[in-house]
Amino acid sequence: MKYINKLEEWLGGALFIAIFGILIAQILARQVFHSPLIWSEELAKLLFVYVGMLGISVAVRKQEHVFIDFLTNLMPEKIRKFTNTLVQLLVFICIFLFIHFGIRTFNGASFPIDALGGISEKWIFAALPVVAILMMFRFIQAQTLNFKTGKSYLPATFFIISAVVLFAILFFAPDWFKVLRISNYIKLGSSSVYVALLVWLIIMFIGVPVGWSLFIATLLYFSMTRWNVVNAATEKLVYSLDSFPLLAVPFYILTGILMNTGGITERIFNFAKSLLGHYTGGMGHVNIGASLLFSGMSGSALADAGGLGQLEIKAMRDAGYDDDICGGITAASCIIGPLVPPSIAMIIYGVIANESIAKLFIAGFIPGVLITLALMAMNYRIAKKRGYPRTPKTTREQLCSSFKQSFWAILTPLLIIGGIFSGLFSPTESAIVAAAYSVIIGKFVYKELTLKTLFNSCIEAMAITGVVALMIMTVTFFGDMIAREQVAMRVANVFVAVADSPLTVLVMINALLLFLGMFIDALALQFLVLPMLIPIAMQFNIDLIFFGVMTTLNMMIGILTPPMGMALFVVARVGNMSVSTVTKGVLPFLIPVFVTLVLITIFPQIITFVPNLLIP
């Protein structure tokens, strides 16, 4: 059983390394040997579909898919147990339908993939049913634990029997499922989309993982309207992962993990300490400065909070800082990551909005620096008021030694940005280069990274990627419903009726995102609302590069605000303190962040000037 439990991890880790090698070969073939590989990109995308699906399966087993629990946490224990049982039942149905639709799309696939020697696209579509069967097995494993620990009323045997019965019906009497077509009984017309959206909100807020709730709502819509087109729509579940720009996401995740395991994080922190530690509020400045440097390599807010957080909080405690400020600064400074290039959030926005990722990278730099300086100013004020001690000023020799040890790590952002703008590699390939560079530094320079650690890091990155992959798949499916019913256009018409200028629209959008960010995870929020907000921005002639940076900053504020502020929970965990302590500490640091948001909203040129200058 031990080896079976590791099946996805070993297979996914091996495929992850295979993609890594293929894309490194692609860069070398083009830049060194001047002979591009025509098959590498297509093969990498095909393997990524499997990596993403295997990651979803791992997250099902560990029950790590993104969900909203603030309402269920308020429920009495018996009601919460009943609600959790309902949630598990809905997830079970989703996985069964993944298998069902996966088989149908696999059988219908016939086109060749020319870049891979004409092999059938069935190889891509096979990922959905094959891995979904594995998901079902993992789901039943998880339910065994849930029943034993009293989290569910339904034992695993119930789901096993249900699965056997449903598969028997599927293979021997598939027409029986036609009774589930609501359109056979009720004709709701254009109201169907509103029913689907209402159901989506209800099941999402009772704890159904966000990705699965999107899938259920969309299927409900199709059952009320156009079930005959559902097969074509479900093809998008797989095609949504068959995207080259999305390959950057898992490799920036991997880079952040490798920085922690390869000794890079500690050296970045020590350099920031030698540079800033002797000023008033020095250790707070070190915390913020280290986050700026770290963000230039990992591109993730929570990677910063989790990777640097423990190190930063310990150093601040040792220097005499109160826990609330230790936690508050650590949480607040982590939002620099998604703004300063490279940025996972910017990559996702670029894919959704079909905008230049290189431009987005550059556009986020100035706001990132502004927030860094603003947080340092607030830290200085608090440190002076509370009388925190300074650390002794480092000597020139100590500063040089610290710089020498961290030099190769600090070089990473310059390598990434320089490579993109020199044309050596694309923004997607920059993630591969960053990960490869982290391997080289960790293995051969700092000598703290082993091959076993590298493989385990790939497995961890694959598992995190699975959470993102489910969101990408189901939000694309959900987007088909939104597009068919022109929901984005309807929302835009409401904005047009209320707003009289682009600034008014931006204020309304900021207010909406700030409110939603209190309850919905930033990643989920990005996938859910951007497809509806981007058309509104276009209708008011708002620059989409500016819009991407503004919405990214806004959503990052969401990870700092309760009750769903993920950074608060991560920092509380790594710092061994209560969430309320972190929340208390982060409140004063929200002021400079809000001021920066207002500033860039009123003066978008702060964001657009540099990218327009460098990339006409």
Swiss-Prot record:
Mode of membrane association: Multi-pass membrane protein
Keywords: Cell inner membrane, Cell membrane, Membrane, Sugar transport, Transmembrane, Transmembrane helix, Transport
Subcellular location, record wording: Cell inner membrane
GO-annotated cellular components: plasma membrane
Listed transmembrane segments: 9-29, 36-56, 83-103, 117-137, 153-173, 196-216, 244-264, 288-308, 332-352, 357-377, 407-427, 431-451, 459-479, 505-525, 527-547, 552-572, 587-607
Region TRAP transporter large permease, annotated ranges: 191-616
Main subcellular location: membrane
Phenotype reported upon loss of the gene: Cells lacking this gene are incapable of transporting sialic acid and thus unable to sialylate its LOS, making the organism unable to survive when exposed to human serum and causing reduced viability in biofilm growth.
Signal peptide: none
Molecular function, one GO term: transmembrane transporter activity
TRAP transporter small permease, as annotated region: 1-190
Protein function: Part of the tripartite ATP-independent periplasmic (TRAP) transport system SiaPT involved in the uptake of sialic acid (N-acetyl-beta-neuraminate). N-Acetylneuraminate can then be incorporated into the lipooligosaccharides (LOS) as a terminal non-reducing sugar, protecting the bacterium from complement-mediated killing by normal human serum.
NCBIfam families in alphabetical order: dctM (TIGR00786)
Family: In the N-terminal section; belongs to the TRAP transporter small permease family.
Quaternary data: The complex comprises the extracytoplasmic solute receptor protein SiaP, and the fused transmembrane protein SiaT.
Miscellaneous comment text of the record: Is essential for lipooligosaccharides (LOS) sialylation and serum resistance.
Protein name per UniProt: Sialic acid TRAP transporter permease protein SiaT
Name of encoding gene: siaT
